[in-house]
């Protein structure tokens, strides 16, 4: 059994014609669309030329008719096609035909197909030849993310018998297909690594171990790493991290990961600097303000923001982004004990702001506040932070749509990019009047309001108090989207999703390109 993080990605190759040999065990994934005939619904192959002969296409479509296939979105069928050298054909429905396809539609279709592969270790696909922007990379991302599995803690008796998807061959004639395919593989591998971290149970991923794994992952791609232990945190005045972590026998950490990408830029002096901050609560009982027992086990995911930040900064180094990226990741375990902070305690955050802790279950904002102040000391141009911040996010937006708060212009930029990459972040306001709800009679701020309304926005207003005025800032609340408690869908498995790794990395790419 292995419990180390770091996803072993399938190999990815690009071909301009159907391989003729050595693919007898492979599955060919072919997209199909509905015919649009209401009285006689059927399915036809969506992308074939120049990879499939007309008689092969006819053979596939005949098999689909025999199965009463309709080409509906996410519908899959397995066919034997003797004229092809592959073991079988797997068709995946895209719904109605389009002139151009949204990348996330193809990403989802690839994920659906990958989840239907069962024991197949090698796939070939014509999905990437469909018209649309970003289709090749989306195809690879969907296949890798859809085939993701986490079995590190299963015994030999219950572990899956197959090795999982190990080889992907993308059929595509575009000149830059290989570059785009490898980019998609790198992004998906980073997301899968974040998933591995989140899926690792808190018995094995506590703050010191989390810091160790972050260090190992980061050093493998050449990042500078600093790990600050509990003694140094206390001495430096990180009151939020220490306060949240003091109830646990497993002390907190703060990790700093630095990608010095400006030296890769054509003009290093003009290269932007981006700070990333992610909440790393390795397990959240709620502390003295304890959570209900029924769903508490899902709080293994309360470090999803930190996992995504670690995955993002390591991906920035791996793909050599020409900007500086500095990640500040606070890590703590929120436990009830004789040493835990109490409702009514006052702590002093890093930087000097005092906070009255009215609810120990609103702990994420306390460790984030410390990290935000430290991150702003680096004088970044932009700050992106993410966390499973509030249950109110799921009330407002559900379990699939992150809430994006922050500086108006940058918030909108982050949300638009999130929607483009398929993580569907939605911009949320931060009304100034909500600050009145955070007034304390004994400290500078209270950590919660006395209202039951606008919980996500109140948390965002709290965090805004710690962001330097000169910094463009966005917070991505992924309380629901970071962890899927329902059934798998598209390229999203049950359990950790890796959201918002793709959003943050796409924002970094956009900043590297456009400033």
UniProtKB/Swiss-Prot annotation:
GO terms for cellular component: cytoplasm; peptidoglycan-based cell wall; plasma membrane. The active site is at 291, 365. It comes from the Bacteria. Its cofactor is Mn(2+). Its EC number is 3.4.11.1, 3.4.11.10. It is an enzyme of class 3 (hydrolase). It catalyses: Release of an N-terminal amino acid, Xaa-|-Yaa-, in which Xaa is preferably Leu, but may be other amino acids including Pro although not Arg or Lys, and Yaa may be Pro. Amino acid amides and methyl esters are also readily hydrolyzed, but rates on arylamides are exceedingly low; Release of an N-terminal amino acid, preferentially leucine, but not glutamic or aspartic acids. It is found in: Cytoplasm. CDD domains: Peptidase_M17. This is Probable cytosol aminopeptidase. It comes from Mycobacterium tuberculosis (strain ATCC 25618 / H37Rv).
């Amino acid at each position: 059994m292995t419990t180390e993080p770091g996803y072993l990605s399938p190999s990815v190759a690009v071909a301009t014609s159907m391989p003729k040999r050595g693919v007898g065990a492979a599955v060919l994934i072919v997209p199909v669309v509905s015919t649009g005939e209401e009285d006689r619904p059927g399915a036809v192959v969506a992308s074939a030329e120049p990879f499939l002969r007309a008689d092969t296409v006819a053979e596939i479509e005949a098999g689909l008719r025999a199965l009463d296939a309709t080409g509906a979105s996410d519908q899959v069928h397995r066919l034997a096609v003797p004229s092809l050298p592959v073991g079988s054909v797997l068709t995946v429905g895209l719904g109605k035909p389009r002139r151009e396809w949204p990348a996330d539609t193809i990403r989802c279709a690839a994920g659906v197909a990958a989840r239907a592969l069962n024991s197949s270790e090698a796939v070939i696909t014509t999905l990437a030849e469909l018209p649309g922007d970003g289709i090749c990379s989306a195809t690879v991302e969907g296949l890798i993310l859809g085939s993701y599995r986490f079995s590190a803690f299963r015994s030999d008796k219950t572990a899956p018998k197959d090795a999982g998807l190990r080889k992907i061959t993308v059929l595509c004639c575009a000149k830059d297909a290989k570059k785009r395919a490898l980019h998609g593989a790198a992004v998906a591998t980073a997301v899968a690594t974040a998933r591995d971290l989140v899926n690792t149970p808190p018995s094995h991923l506590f703050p010191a171990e989390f810091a160790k794994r972050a260090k190992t992952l980061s050093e493998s791609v050449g990042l500078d790493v600093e790990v600050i232990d509990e003694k140094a945190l206390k001495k430096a005045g990180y009151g939020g991290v220490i306060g949240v972590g003091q109830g646990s026998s497993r002390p907190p950490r703060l990790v700093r990961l630095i990608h010095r990408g400006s030296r890769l830029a054509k003009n290093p002096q003009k290269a932007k600097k981006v700070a990333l901050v992610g909440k790393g609560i390795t397990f959240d009982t709620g502390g003295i303000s304890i959570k209900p027992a029924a769903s508490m086990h899902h709080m293994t995911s309360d470090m999803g923001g930190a996992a995504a930040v670690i995955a993002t900064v390591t991906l920035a180094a791996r793909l050599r982004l020409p900007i500086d990226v500095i990640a500040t990741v606070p890590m703590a375990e929120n436990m009830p004990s004789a040493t835990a902070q109490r409702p009514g305690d006052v702590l002093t955050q890093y930087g000097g702001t005092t906070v009255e802790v009215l609810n120990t279950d609103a702990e994420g904002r306390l460790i984030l506040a410390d990290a935000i102040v430290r991150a702003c000391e680096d004088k970044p141009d932009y700050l992106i932070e993410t966390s499973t911040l509030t249950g109110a996010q799921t009330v407002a937006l559900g379990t699939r749509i992150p809430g994006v708060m922050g500086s108006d212009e940058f918030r909108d930029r982050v949300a638009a990019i999130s929607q483009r990459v398929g993580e569907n972040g939605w911009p949320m306001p931060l009304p100034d009047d909500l600050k009145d709800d955070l007034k304390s009679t004994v400290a500078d701020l209270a950590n919660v309001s006395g209202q039951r309304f606008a919980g996500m926005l109140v948390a965002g207003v709290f965090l805004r108090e710690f962001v330097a005025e000169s910094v463009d800032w966005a917070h991505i609340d992924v309380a629901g989207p970071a962890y899927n408690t329902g059934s798998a869908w598209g390229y999203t498995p049950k359990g950790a999703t890796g959201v918002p790794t793709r959003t943050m990395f796409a924002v970094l790419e956009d900043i590297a390109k456009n400033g």
